[in-house]
Amino acid sequence: TINHRQEQYAVAQTDSLTHDINSVLKYKSQYIGDNSNTANLFYNLPLNNVSMKFQINSDDCSLTVNYLDTIWNIGEEKVQRDLVYNSAAAFSLIDNLTKITYEFSGKSYSFTRSQFENAFGTPLSSLLNQKVWSEKIQSKLDDTTFVEEFY
């Protein structure tokens, strides 16, 4: 049924290995300063089922995402994989975003655009096509060693 397919699609959007990058292309922006655009992007990426708050620093074009839960409660492997995915998506879609910090109760992680462009060997915006995204981003996230290089 249609409802069943919609439910399956919604569940797939909460996992970095099955997320549809096309679903967030409408949030592509040159600037980090648009609060509602940034919030809507993260509300449509993996970990969207965890309550979060945002803080944008327009001086250095950085973003802090404060997840209102613990890593232990969500699962460390899922958190690490999804944060790499969400960072790749955000750096790909927001042109002037330079750094993202993710805060959880008791722990935080920070990533930079250059760290991601070095890891993937290309400007991230060039990967914004579902086939290329699946090959270059999602397929690597299944490799724990690759994901751990970011931590």
What is the meaning of each model-derived region?
Residues 5, 12, 53, 82-90, ...:
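Short, flexible coil/linker segments at or flanking structured domains
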Residues 57-62, 92-98, 106:
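A short, structured loop/turn motif at beta-sheet edges
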Residues 101-151:
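Polar/charged, Gly/Pro-rich intrinsically disordered segments
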Residues 64-65, 101:
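Structural recognition of the beta-strand scaffold that forms the well-ordered cores
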Residues 65-81, 116:
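A short interface-forming secondary-structure element
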Residues 75-97:
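Short, non-transmembrane amphipathic alpha-helical segments
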Residues 2-62, 69-74, 140-151:
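N-proximal, solvent-exposed amphipathic alpha-helical segments enriched in charged/polar residues
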